[in-house]
Structure formats: structure tokens, C-alpha cells
């Protein structure tokens, strides 16, 4: 499946301010940016600040500064999910009133034996919304989609996920609900992101279907992993992006995405590297794997 034409493509990058951008973030951002710009599409920026307790002070400003110093130019104003709570609440209440969602008072300890697959303990108990998580009822159906890099992906929502949380017990809205509503609101046609979100996609497809929303195309790029197999990330103290390393790290990110920048780009400026990337971007060259060890990258 190919990306949209230039007249209709709208992509996005949606970082979480729980820490600074690192090399793994750069790979995902670069893939989404080049996939949009290569066809003359728009590229939007969204700050996924749904979880204030986990937000690192100064992270939002640092993320914007890093993107700018690495040559990313977004269209329009950045939006913040923290400004969208009314929209999330309106849809959540509608789902609850229609019987498509319900309140759940299960504790983490109660759910430990079920290994992340919710068994429906509160499904028919009729709890009030107060001091409870809100879960979306899922059908006993298998959802499938064809990812532009990873190929066909299938997941049975009932057996492999169970009814999933759309608002946490502490009142914070869950990622699955927010991302679906924001992508639709912004008119996103193409989602390019890390392969760690591949298994979230069927839940999002179900929500889109339930709410009558259009479904974007998806492209999940391989995660960059450390020697122990963990992905690069804030949880593992991956070093933040620094401005002085922008040109070599952009070239390294291009190679991680299977692109083939020529040797004469060594020593080039950020603008020159980005221009080459936009002119030569080929999503078909992205490795069709879930991860790429950082140690393999030159």
C-alpha cells in the first residue's frame, strides 16, 4: 500500500513529554516527516501530554527545540491533548450512555492473574463512573489490517485484549481514545510510528469503526533496540538528542530506515541531509522487521 497523493496526505508526529527525544524518537519522527514531505503532504505536531504526573519538567520545550535543530518544520500550530479533554469527555459519556462502555473497579492486583487480557469481571455489574475506570466493550471478532511495512496484522480483540480502558480510574483519559479522536479531528490520513504501537492498532480500528470515523493508513517502523533487547527510550535512560550531533544522527536514522544516503553527505548540513531525504525517500526500503539493533547501525 502506498502513501496518499500530495493533495490529500496529512501525517503527524505525536511525542509524549515524559522525557526528551532520543535516537529512537528521531527514527520515528524522520520516517513520518519524510513520508509526508516526499509527496508534498502536510506534517502536523501534537503533544501527547495526557499524563501530567509522568511529564518531565521542561520536556515539551526541549522536544520543540530538538525538532527545530534537527530540521523538522511542522504545519500549523502544535496542539496539546491537555486542551482536548472536553472532546474526549463528550465521546466517552456518549459511549457510556449507549452501553458500549462501562465502569470498572478492578484493582491491578485483581487483574494480575489474567496477564493483561481483561476477563470482563465488571462488564455487567452496572458500577457508577465515580472512582472507577471506564472500559470499552469489545466484540468477539478478529481485526486485521495491512501495514505498509509490517504487512498483514491480525488480532482477536476478545481473546487477545479484552475490554480496554478509555478513561483511567484517576480520571485521566487513555491513549487509545485520545489518539483516535485527535487523528480524526486533525484529518490524519497516514500514521507513521514505531512498531511498539502495532498491537494498539486493532483497538483503534475498532474505535474508529464504532464512532464512524475514517481509518488512516498505517506504517510501523522498526524499533531501535539496545543490546539487551529493550527499545531505546526514556525508561532506559537513552541519551537525549543534542544539537551538535544533528547531521550524523540524521544520517544514522536514514540508514536505520533502510535509506541509502551517499558518502558525500558526510559533513553535510542538516538542511542538505533533509533535502536529500525528501528527494530520495522510499518507504519500500524500510526493514520489514519489528526491531533493528542499534549496534548494527553505522
UniProtKB/Swiss-Prot annotation:
One of its GO terms (molecular function) is glutamate-tRNA ligase activity. Zn(2+) binds at residues 104, 106, 118, 122. Keywords: Aminoacyl-tRNA synthetase, ATP-binding, Ligase, Metal-binding, Nucleotide-binding, Zinc. Disulfide bonds: none annotated. GO terms for biological process: glutamyl-tRNA aminoacylation; tRNA modification. Binds 1 zinc ion per subunit. ATP binds at residue 234. A motif ('KMSKS' region) lies at residues 231-235. The keyword Iron does not apply. Its cofactor is Zn(2+). L-glutamate binds at residues 12-16, 48, 175, 193. Its EC number is 6.1.1.-. A motif ('HIGH' region) lies at residues 15-25. Belongs to the class-I aminoacyl-tRNA synthetase family. GluQ subfamily. HAMAP family: Glu_Q_tRNA_synth. Catalyzes the tRNA-independent activation of glutamate in presence of ATP and the subsequent transfer of glutamate onto a tRNA(Asp). Glutamate is transferred on the 2-amino-5-(4,5-dihydroxy-2-cyclopenten-1-yl) moiety of the queuosine in the wobble position of the QUC anticodon. This is Glutamyl-Q tRNA(Asp) synthetase. It comes from Pseudomonas fluorescens (strain ATCC BAA-477 / NRRL B-23932 / Pf-5).
Amino acid at each position: 500500500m502506498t502513501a496518499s497523493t500530495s493533495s490529500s496526505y496529512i501525517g503527524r508526529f505525536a511525542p509524549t513529554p515524559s522525557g526528551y527525544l532520543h535516537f529512537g524518537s528521531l527514527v520515528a519522527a524522520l520516517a513520518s516527516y519524510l513520508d509526508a514531505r516526499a509527496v508534498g503532504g502536510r506534517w502536523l505536531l501534537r503533544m501527547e501530554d495526557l499524563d501530567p504526573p509522568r511529564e518531565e519538567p521542561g520536556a515539551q520545550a526541549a522536544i520543540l527545540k530538538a525538532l527545530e535543530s534537527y530540521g523538522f518544520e511542522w504545519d500549523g500550530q502544535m496542539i496539546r491533548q491537555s486542551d482536548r479533554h472536553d472532546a474526549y469527555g463528550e465521546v466517552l459519556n456518549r459511549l457510556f450512555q449507549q452501553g458500549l462502555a462501562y465502569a470498572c473497579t478492578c484493582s491491578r492486583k485483581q487483574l494480575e492473574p489474567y496477564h493483561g487480557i481483561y476477563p470482563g469481571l465488571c462488564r455487567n455489574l452496572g458500577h457508577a463512573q465515580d472512582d472507577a475506570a471506564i472500559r470499552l466493550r469489545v466484540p468477539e471478532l478478529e481485526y486485521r489490517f495491512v501495514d505498509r511495512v509490517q504487512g498483514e496484522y491480525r488480532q482477536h480483540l476478545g481473546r487477545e485484549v479484552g475490554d480496554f480502558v478509555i478513561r483511567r480510574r484517576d480520571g485521566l483519559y487513555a491513549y487509545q481514545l485520545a489518539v483516535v479522536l485527535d487523528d480524526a479531528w486533525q484529518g490524519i490520513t497516514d500514521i507513521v510510528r514505531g512498531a511498539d504501537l502495532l498491537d494498539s492498532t486493532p483497538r483503534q480500528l475498532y474505535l474508529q469503526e464504532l464512532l464512524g470515523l475514517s481509518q488512516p493508513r498505517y506504517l510501523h517502523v522498526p524499533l531501535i533496540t539496545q543490546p539487551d533487547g529493550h527499545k531505546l527510550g526514556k525508561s532506559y535512560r537513552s541519551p537525549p538528542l543534542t544539537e551538535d550531533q544533528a547531521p550524523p544522527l540524521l544520517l544514522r536514522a536514514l540508514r536505520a530506515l533502510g535509506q541509502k544516503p551517499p558518502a558525500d553527505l558526510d559533513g553535510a548540513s542538516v538542511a542538505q541531509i533533509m533535502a536529500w531525504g525528501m528527494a530520495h525517500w522510499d518507504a519500500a526500503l524500510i526493514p520489514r522487521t519489528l526491531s533493528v539493533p542499534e549496534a548494527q547501525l553505522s
